[in-house]
Structure formats: C-alpha cells, structure tokens
C-alpha cells in the first residue's frame, strides 16, 4: 500500500519578528549559486521536529495495528533523515522494519533523490513524468535559486533518470 504524500516535514528554520523562513529559503551552502534569504514560491511545508516525530510514530502505530511489518519512507532530505533516526524505536515499539531509499545505496550520483532540484531529481522526473519538466522556464542568463547539485540544464536527461531508477530498484 502507498500512503498519501505528507506535505509537512522538518527542516532548518529562521524566525524573526517580521518573517519565518524554512529549508531552501535560507542559503546555507551547497547550492550552485549563493542567494539571499527569501521566501521561495511553494515554501509551505515546515513542521517542528517534535510534531513531525510524533506524527511518524502515530503512523507507525496505526500501520502496525493494521498488520504491516515493513514501512518504507523517503522524501525531502530532513524528513528522510528524521524518519531514519526513528527506525530503532519503530522496531522496538511496533515491530516495524523501517528503511528509506538512502539505506539502499551508498552516497553516489545514482542514489535516489540525492540533490535538490538539480540533475538527479530532474532526471528522475524526466524518466517518469516528462510533461512536468519545463526547462524552458529557466530565465535566460539567470542562475537558478535553491538548487543543490549538478546543474540540470547540463546534466539532466530521461536516460540518466531511468538509470537512477533501475540501479535503486535492483539494489
């Protein structure tokens, strides 16, 4: 069974009296081009760590009660890492074996979703849902904001995406 996507998760944050910024709203390195702190379009997913942890444990309890033995979760980096940190507790409390796609392969360019809006994620989308990739939306001469990883304009392709998927499925 595949549960609906969770649109809330943990991430780094910055609060001051005038604004709240989360995740890639904050430049902290690792992106192709540095950029100022700003609220990015679509940045609406943040949940405090403890609330996220409580939610994941409740999901684990419900799935265990329904007879599930294995729970696989993967998504946005911080939520994936926090889910992984709960693997032992989920096993002890609910008898659930938990893992993420990061558990399957070591850190490699072919690891599933190992960047942020860059060549890896773009290539996966090109392979699975090519109609969603709109490379023409990159403004001519402007560098992308909030991208971490290899530049998809140069390195992304449907073939690369299929290779990522095949390697991870086989692993």
Where are these regions (language model features)?
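Extended, histidine- and acidic-residue-enriched regions that form the cofactor-binding/catalytic faces
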Residues: 1-171
